[in-house]
């Protein structure tokens, strides 16, 4: 499997964390695409956030492409999201905006968990109620409580 990371207005340290972590988790080759900025077409000035669906649609439709941004993002009907993905599709987007903390190890864990979660959606997984990386996170505390790994049930359903 190949994973393409598309940096979108995000620091290089975050990209490096993912480029070093994802190959081990998914037994995948990881390629970092040239960095670019999030399109202003996706910006909602009244919310001061970027629309995650708009960003998702601007990513190359190559399975698996993970857009990673430092911008705050939202989806329709939500105050914010950590990410959005095409279920069983090719693309996902992850925002690290609300994952930031002074604790560098905790930041790394959060970023990796949410990247694995979004890639899990691309690989066909829905949200899970088990103690699993696919558990829905409504807050950063929810992210901190879940593991970085898939439960057995989810691991058996992954469609590479």
From Swiss-Prot:
<comment type="subunit">
    <text>Monomer.</text>
</comment>
<keyword id="KW-0862">Zinc</keyword>
<keyword id="KW-0479">Metal-binding</keyword>
<keyword id="KW-0645">Protease</keyword>
<dbReference type="GO" id="GO:0006508">
    <property type="term" value="P:proteolysis"/>
</dbReference>
<dbReference type="InterPro" id="IPR012091">
    <property type="entry name" value="Pept_M54_archaemetzncn_arc/bac"/>
</dbReference>
<feature type="binding site">
    <location>
        <position position="128"/>
    </location>
    <ligand>
        <name>Zn(2+) 2</name>
    </ligand>
</feature>
<feature type="binding site">
    <location>
        <position position="154"/>
    </location>
    <ligand>
        <name>Zn(2+) 2</name>
    </ligand>
</feature>
<dbReference type="Pfam" id="PF07998">
    <property type="entry name" value="Peptidase_M54"/>
</dbReference>
<keyword id="KW-0482">Metalloprotease</keyword>
<feature type="binding site">
    <location>
        <position position="121"/>
    </location>
    <ligand>
        <name>Zn(2+) 1</name>
    </ligand>
</feature>
<dbReference type="GO" id="GO:0008270">
    <property type="term" value="F:zinc ion binding"/>
</dbReference>
<feature type="binding site">
    <location>
        <position position="132"/>
    </location>
    <ligand>
        <name>Zn(2+) 2</name>
    </ligand>
</feature>
<dbReference type="InterPro" id="IPR012962">
    <property type="entry name" value="Pept_M54_archaemetzincn"/>
</dbReference>
<feature type="binding site">
    <location>
        <position position="151"/>
    </location>
    <ligand>
        <name>Zn(2+) 2</name>
    </ligand>
</feature>
<keyword id="KW-0378">Hydrolase</keyword>
<comment type="similarity">
    <text>Belongs to the peptidase M54 family.</text>
</comment>
<feature type="binding site">
    <location>
        <position position="117"/>
    </location>
    <ligand>
        <name>Zn(2+) 1</name>
    </ligand>
</feature>
<feature type="active site" description="Proton acceptor">
    <location>
        <position position="118"/>
    </location>
</feature>
<feature type="binding site">
    <location>
        <position position="127"/>
    </location>
    <ligand>
        <name>Zn(2+) 1</name>
    </ligand>
</feature>
<dbReference type="InterPro" id="IPR024079">
    <property type="entry name" value="MetalloPept_cat_dom_sf"/>
</dbReference>
<protein>
    <recommendedName>
        <fullName>Archaemetzincin</fullName>
        <ecNumber>3.4.-.-</ecNumber>
    </recommendedName>
</protein>
<dbReference type="GO" id="GO:0008237">
    <property type="term" value="F:metallopeptidase activity"/>
</dbReference>
<comment type="function">
    <text>Probable zinc metalloprotease whose natural substrate is unknown.</text>
</comment>
